[in-house]
Structures are given as C-alpha cells and as structure tokens.
Amino acid sequence: MVAMPPAWCSVALALLVALHEGEGQATATPEQPVPSPRAQGSHLRPRRCSCSSWLDKECVYFCHLDIIWVNTPGQTAPYGLGNPPRRRRRSLPRRCECSSARDPACATFCHRRPWADAVAVPGSDSPEDTFQAGKTWTTAGELLQQLRGISAANIRFARRQQEAIRAPRPTPSRRRKR
C-alpha cells in the first residue's frame, strides 16, 4: 500500500467536494446574466415581464412569478413587487414589457389588442370618441334589448339578495357545550 502525504489527500478531497457541489448548477445564459457580487446578498425576484399599471391585477399575477397574494377585505394586495415610485413609467398602449423576446406566451399576453382597446387613457379622448371606438350597434333595437337583459339580470340578483336576507336563520342552542 502506497502512503500518500496527508496534505495531498486534503487537497484531493476539497477538489472532489467543490466539483460535486458545482455539478447541479446551470451556467449563466445571455438572458440571465451572472449577478454582481453586491447583488448576491439580496433576493432577485424572477419576473416574466413588467406591467404598465399596478391596477391591472391579471398582469401583475402573470408577470411576477414569486408574488404572494394576500386577501384583504377591500382588495387582493400583491406583496413582494418592489418600490412602485422607482418603476420606469411607460405609455399605456402596451400592457406590459416582456423580459425575454423569445417568450411567445408573454408576447401574446402583453401585446394582444383587446386589452389596449378596452383601456381608456384619462384625458386622451372625449367620451364620445371613446364610445365610437367601441362596438357600434347595428340598430337601436339591439342596444335596447341588451339594456333590458342587463336590467332584468340586475333585478333578479337584487331579489335573490333580499330573499337571502329575509330567510330565517337557525337560532343557536342556548345550552353550553362542555
């Protein structure tokens, strides 16, 4: 049996451990640059894209991959999104900007046309121009039928709400549980 010096054994062991630890890590791609030494201590939040409006909850949910949604009585509040005042402002015709141009799902989500048509930029158009840009009704009767249908649905909903309020609730027993 050949006797090896203890120093060589520890160097070989350290080299094997270092190679084994680095085995599962992926190399950096051009889309994901190597983080700077300063940023290694902070958590980098993965984002698929960056939304133009914080009020667009669907966009925020789609773009920010590691947000935590907390249900509050008034609204659903996203946490972990950074500092909104530092965010670069963008024009509204685009819903969001994709981090990678090679992501077709993101490009479809951010640049699809129906969302841009549905958003009205305050002060950009008069209400008449906004109404004309939407769907034009072929006849006044069609518009009237749509409004009547909406009104009937609202009345049915209000009646159900009133019935639910008036419905007798079972009274709790007066006996204490042990």
Swiss-Prot record:
InterPro entries cross-referenced by the UniProt entry: Endothelin, Endothelin_toxin_CS, Endothln-like_toxin
Disulfide bonds: C49-C63, C51-C59
Keyword DNA-binding among UniProt keywords: no
Keywords: Cleavage on pair of basic residues, Disulfide bond, Secreted, Signal, Vasoactive, Vasoconstrictor
Site label Cleavage, positions: W69, V70
Domain of life, source organism: Eukaryota
Propeptide residue interval(s): 25-46, 70-178
Region feature Endothelin-like, mapped onto this chain: 96-111
Subcellular location: Secreted
Region described as Disordered: spans on this chain: 25-45
Signal peptide feature range: 1-24
A cellular component annotation (GO) from this entry: extracellular space
Pfam family, one: Endothelin
Any one Gene Ontology molecular-function term assigned to this protein's record: hormone activity
TM spans (from-to): none
UniProt record, GO biological process: intracellular calcium ion homeostasis; positive regulation of smooth muscle contraction; regulation of systemic arterial blood pressure by endothelin; regulation of vasoconstriction; vein smooth muscle contraction
Function text: Endothelins are endothelium-derived vasoconstrictor peptides.
Family in the record: Belongs to the endothelin/sarafotoxin family.
The protein's name: Endothelin-2
Native source species: Equus caballus (Horse)
Organism taxonomic ancestry: Eukaryota, Metazoa, Chordata, Craniata, Vertebrata
Gene name, Swiss-Prot/TrEMBL: EDN2
